[in-house]
Amino acid sequence: MLPWNVRRSGMLTYSTMTETFQEQFARGYKAFKEGGLADSRAIFIKAVRSAAEEGDRPSLAEALCGLGQAERGIGNLEAARHHYQGAAVLYRQIGPPASLAYTLRHEADILREESLPAEAEPLYLEAEAIYRQQGEEAELDLANTLRGLALVYESTGRADGSRLLFEQARALYAKCNVQAGVAECEEKLSPRK
């Protein structure tokens, strides 16, 4: 008979490891920020597997988001979208709403990048509604969401709607002191020559 902490595969269960999920996530995000996309991906794959084995749905949702981010960074948009979709399913069940909105926005960003504006728009709108309910603490996230939605409107010929969204995003970026966001919105709002 195998010891209680060893699976038939011979691997230790996650509960016997010394690294917590939060430590693992921190390593994965650090690797991502430092350009180690393959390392980040490997860390989050391990975290997804471990969280699934543990039945830890909050950690699984976060690990799926991290894996989605790594896949997107690598350029594997289809896999990234799949991971964000999985995380969204979990966040719809367990919350919190801000995590759901984050996940929806990133999935929408990918759909927009894949030239699928009709699929991206409802996700942006849902994320926008959640962020507006969150108030001041979510202003930067709301600005990013409005920017993405404005780009969808722009790509589908809705110039007036796009302009209004870029104006709202610019004001929020200014309030959050994100000059790159302000500059992009101002460029989009400037008359074309």
Language model region names:
Residues 44, 51, 91, 131-133, ...:
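Eukaryotic all-alpha helical interaction scaffolds
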Residues 22, 62, 102-103, 140-144, ...:
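Residue register of alpha-helical TPR repeats
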Residues 12-15, 34, 52-56, 90-96, ...:
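Short coil/turn linkers that connect adjacent helices within long alpha-helical scaffolds
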Residues 19, 59, 79, 99, ...:
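Structural signature of alpha-solenoid helical repeat junctions
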